[in-house]
Amino acid sequence: NTYPVFPLCHLQPSRTTMTTLKTRKPCITTISEICDSEDHTKNHQHTKLPPVIKDLVANWSSNDCFEHISPVALPSHPAIIDIIRQTRSLLFPGYFSAAKLHQNNLEYFIGQETTDLYDKLTEQIMMAIRHDCRRMLQPCTNCEERSHRLALAFIETLPQVTATLATDIRATLAGDPATQSPDEVIFCYPGLLAISIYRIAHELYLLKVPIIPRIMTEHAHSLTGIDIHPGATIGPGFFIDHGTGVVIGETTIIGKDVRLYQGVTLGALSLPRDAGEKLRFIKRHPTIEDNVIIYANSTILGGDTVIGANAIIGGNIWLTESVQAGLKVMLKRPELIYT
């Protein structure tokens, strides 16, 4: 069977339109001519880019915009995410790797993963230190030797981090009847994911590793909606239920066996515009003592605010003052109106 072929210009114009058509470009009838025409259009538009490029370069040459134009590379965001993944595979063997683990190969697996993690982390720490030194105009700190030392110090904290995360998992199992097993908590719970990444980042923060801890916790923030600053101090047995919208500021101190629900903010009071640098190392966020429960959407602010042990803070509470140990803070029951 044959099928009729219709050229792109098969329609014949009427006499009334002939005058108009004479002024138009010749009709394109082949694919190659169409492609050539498109390439011509693209190339013509490219000629308009150089002035924009010059404006961008001029912006970066001023002090009004931010750039990183330097022979020293910044830490790699994808590489740091991979470090998180690999660290979690060490903290929870068998959960986040494709390897089939048993007692005969476990030590080999842990050895290989730990060595690989050490090398990757050393490289990223060295980039972070070099960038920080150049940005702050600091004298040379022997960044290569320092990065190896810091990476090793971090690796040495992993047994304790594993033990602390085990208490967080047990707290989740004890506090949430909806969970069926530790596997479900480890695989599925955004609260534990955010806490795990926080505990990894916190150890690097304590070692004064630049920028990498914050990249880690902000990655967790983007995944879970839970914002925990790596500088916060959080005790064992920590449980965040549901999690979305939780904020925990840099100088927050949280005791052991504390439970938070979604939307809780442990934050700082509003600061004057020029006060940030002066208060950078001052305690700005609350202290939550042992065995406290804070229900959904409550906000607790201020560095002098202390929530005493075993206190319960109800939902939708706004607090800027301390609460004694063992007290319950609840809103007065609102009046419902039916119409």
Predicted feature residues:
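Terminal amphipathic alpha-helical/low-complexity segments used for targeting or macromolecular assembly
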Residues: 5-11, 18-215
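Structural signal for interior beta-strand "rungs" in well-ordered beta-sheet cores
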Residues: 221-337
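Amphipathic alpha-helical interaction segments
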Residues: 11-14, 326
